[in-house]
Amino acid sequence: MKSIWRRRDFLFQSGGGISGLALAHLLNQDGLLAASQPAACDAKAKGYNPYAPKPPHFAPRAKSVISLFMSGGPSQLDTFDPKPALTRYAGKPLEGKGEVVVRQGNPGPLMPSPFTFRKYGQCGMDVSQLFPNLAEHVDDMAFLRSVYGKSNDHVQATYELNTGKIQMGLPSVGSWVTYGLGSENQSLPAFVVIYDHRGGPLGGPANWSAGYMPAAYQATVFRSAGDPIIDLHPPAEIGPERQRDRLDLLAKLNEIDLKNYPGSSELAARISSYELAYRMQGCAPEAVDLTRESEATLKLYGMDDKTTEPFARQCLMARRLVERGVRFVQLYHGGLGQQNRDTWDAHDNVKENHTYHAAEVDRPISALLTDLKARGLLDSTLVVWHGEFGRMPISQKGVGRDHNPGTMTVWMAGAGIKGGQIIGASDEFGYKAEQQPISVHDLHATLLHLLGIDHTRLTYLFNGRNMRLTDVYGELIPQIVA
């Protein structure tokens, strides 16, 4: 610990402070050195490199993942899992399902969807009126209608979808993927999070933390508004030679400590993070520069519409990142603010809430799938859409819906997945997963499998135990991996 503080003292005393040297988002405790003269985008990492490409356990179907996280919990009943029984039994209590546990207030009567559904594609998939653009892709999408979670609390449920457990402090799925496979681009982070312009999700950075792993495996946060990467450039008075000299000197100090404490994986990861920050100077600005896109592409995503522009920007950045070898990109839609307005948390009015939020994402997500397919990237990219839980078939406050971890719909596309299929089913009211219930561990095991990773073999030794993303659970979803 003393040597770490000496390095910090050196940084401050050498002028400019950490803010002038750091990519603050890459390493919260120490920051990362930046350079005013960037390294080449194909530069190789020096010394120990946690991002070095690692061989998969078997031939992968996907190289990258784009996770589309709809914060707040979209309603499966009003999007991709229609329930005619809700119309037949509208206004009646939900019976025969045991104790009905709600998050707020008392259980209301059964409430039909305020949205109409129609069939799309050669497969005849039912999709609500909320997603007219996305519905055109159903033949490339697999709908998992029986995914369930353990908590009806936003924070706990979000942690579960990201880490497999409802408590904080564990490595996220993106961290596990980075740890298991490394990165195909040594000048960009392997794991990137881009959250909503209104703010990050409930639970904050613990959702993309590396937990008990070295900090190098946590996500790098890119902003969806303004400069995507903060603190990328040092102060103008610090020239490239001076900056490079500082980086080299700091690396030497770290190397001395690494020799004295060879078991310090955190220190080794910190050294590699400094080098990554230096290399990012060259290619990160280009990777997120949307002005390089054609007018037709910008319009396709909805950059010309103030409603769709924020999430269009996130989706377009995601495509550019996976195109450049970034392994795991997670986009959050719905941010902190007024929870019932700024997220999919439709306690008050599901029609008003979901109409508003679906309009923000329908066109951009549709464009993302179109663009990936046109560029030949969809076969090597797994796209996953979900929230933290589903919603209740009973009403809340007359026209809203409460949280429901009992079932939700997740869809997947790309990675050679057979599209146009429905996997699993919820009960007649959409209250509980009934046919082929799919746990979050099953979801994670399947995601890792598509990347060529056996979830039972991907382990990290912590406190004397070989830890897994899926703990001692997790079954592959056969229709997805077939």
Regions found by a protein language model. Name each.
Residues 1-482:
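Ligand-binding pockets and gating/stacking loops
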